[in-house]
Curated annotation (Swiss-Prot):
Compartments, as annotated in UniProt: Cytoplasm, Cytosol; Nucleus
Assembly information from the UniProt record: Component of the bag6/bat3 complex.
Major localisation: cytoplasm
Gene Ontology cellular-component terms listed: BAT3 complex; cytosol; nucleus
Name assigned to this protein: Ubiquitin-like protein 4A
Alphabetical keyword list: Cytoplasm, Nucleus, Transport
Gene3D superfamilies: Phosphatidylinositol 3-kinase Catalytic Subunit, Chain A, domain 1 (3.10.20.90)
């Protein structure tokens, strides 16, 4: 089905999607068409903000629907843009080996799993990781201590 995505500043794009596509997949298509990074996009349908993980069918978005695009100001902490580069690189690699739809699904899964893994880290986990990175000589001794 075809959707129209209209940015508040006048740009407009027509994209081809299916009802089973996620909002995140739509955002990636919008990024290609309008050159607006996914991280800066906020899509609205009938005044309601759309969540990345939901399918278009969840919001009853059908053929010919019109989505509004709000562009957020670019505010990214240092080092965060490297994450975007990593996801783009992974996307390029996946598209070489899978169909575009399958590559998109795999990328979404990896991103969700990555975010989930990060959210499960405790402060103790982060402290142990930091110690191993900053003081590798101490972490080896600490690892041996757990074996006793």
């Amino acid at each position: 089905m075809q959707l129209t995505v209209k940015a508040l500043k006048g740009k407009e794009a027509h994209i081809q999607v299916s009802e089973g596509d996620t909002v995140l997949a739509v955002k990636r298509l919008v990024e290609e068409k309008l050159q607006v990074p996914v991280s800066q996009q906020r899509l609205l349908f009938r005044g309601k903000s759309l969540a990345d993980e939901h399918c278009l069918s969840h919001y009853s978005i059908g053929p010919g629907s019109r989505l509004n695009l709000m562009v957020k100001d670019q505010v990214a902490p240092e080092g965060h843009s490297g994450n975007n580069t990593a996801w783009k690189s992974l996307s390029v690699i996946l598209r070489k080996h899978f169909s575009p739809a399958d590559a998109e699904r795999v990328l979404e899964y990896v991103q969700k799993d990555y975010e989930r893994s990060l959210s499960l880290l405790s402060l103790d986990d982060i402290e142990r990781l930091a110690t191993r990175i900053l003081h590798p000589q101490y972490s080896e001794a600490a690892d041996l201590g757990f074996l006793d």
